Design a protein with these regions (language model features):
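A fold-wide structural signal in alpha/beta-hydrolase
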Residues: 1-7, 41, 65
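Residue-level signal for short, function-critical loop segments
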Residues: 9, 46, 119
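Gly/Ser-rich "nucleophile elbow"/oxyanion-hole loop immediately N-terminal to the catalytic nucleophile
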Residues: 12-47, 52, 57-63, 107
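Short, solvent-exposed loop/turn and secondary-structure capping segments
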Residues: 14-19, 53-55, 66-68, 76-82, ...
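Short beta-strand immediately N-terminal to the catalytic nucleophile in serine-hydrolase-like folds
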Residues: 42-44, 69, 116
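C-terminal catalytic histidine-bearing segment of alpha/beta-hydrolase fold enzymes
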Residues: 122, 126-152
Length: 152
């Protein structure tokens, strides 16, 4: 077993340089170790869970399964729910939606998902995972979901 824990260059939601760090770490591991490409799994918690959603939906061909834990999945959904109508310019909203795991959920049709979230999470609200799991189930994706009491 080979385990990678790329940092993703800090707090960038695993986009841009953070996404590249993860992809380059996987490529380097494949180059240096005899890895079965059908047994590469992606997981992470909180910011890492956000990265797991993001990277798995953009690169589903790389993973046998994904297990996001307390991951954030869609910025506009969150801001609309918390603050009402978004004040972002239309181009910004459409840009973020084009890269949002929530709007790319269909790309996980062939990638089993095992999602976990704490019911009392105050950083990434539990409705983030609930919404994604509902969407995945509507799309008939393979998804298991567990909410953990007293976990925040």
């Amino acid at each position: 077993m080979v385990e990678l824990q790329p940092f993703g260059r800090g707090n960038n939601w695993y986009r841009g340089l953070g996404e590249n760090d993860v992809l380059q770490a996987i490529a380097a591991a494949k180059q240096h170790y005899s890895l079965d490409p059908d047994r590469i799994y992606l997981t992470g918690g909180s910011m890492g869970g956000t990265g797991a959603w993001h990277i798995a939906t953009l690169h589903p061909e790389l993973f046998a399964a994904v297990a996001p834990v307390c991951g954030h999945l869609e910025y506009a959904y969150d801001s609309d729910r918390e603050f009402g109508d978004s004040t972002e310019p239309a181009w910004s909203r459409s840009f973020w939606q084009s890269r949002s795991p929530y709007f790319l959920a269909a790309d996980l049709l062939n990638v089993p998902v095992n999602c976990h979230h704490g019911k009392d999470d105050t950083i990434v609200p539990v409705y983030q995972s609930q919404a994604m799991v509902r969407k995945l189930r509507e799309l008939k994706c393979s998804v298991d979901y567990e909410e953990h009491s007293y976990v925040g």
